Amino acid sequence: MKKILCVGYRDWALNIYKKIAKNYNGADVTIVSSHDEYSDSFVRNYNPDIILFYGWSWIISNSVVNNYKCIMLHPSKLPKYRGGSPLQNQIIKGEKDSGVTLFFMSARMDAGPIIFQETMSLSGSIDDIFERIEELGYKGTMQFLKSPTKGVEQAEEDATYYKRRTKDQSEITLKE
């Protein structure tokens, strides 16, 4: 039985994980939803085949990244908008469309091989955007679980980087 460790605390990530647990037969799915629950020793003891880090903001140790198949979801069309606060940074830059990218984690931030990428609109409320992220994240994850791939390397020459915005910097008021 395949063991899948799902790590994340955001509602949209937890919704993806719950759907995977319900719909992916033949898997032992464990969900970790707080920083206090997650540790390298927990990962070693559980010994998962795959770790999903969706909606997770803390640094993951090199020992976990190097010894397990770790997949991350990033709400941009990587390699664009690597780094923190991708949604806020895209909206501030005037982007109308974004994407959901699933990729294998590597030692470099948001730079691993892409296993799924699909465009999504940034229109509507933040809840509308989170709903799209959830839908595409689930779609991409199930696609990967059913037909694993090694992924496609990112085009480094197209990479852009952004810093995480503070809570105050992340409050965005859009004008009609």
Task: Label every PLM stretch briefly.
Residues 1-176:
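One-carbon transfer enzymes
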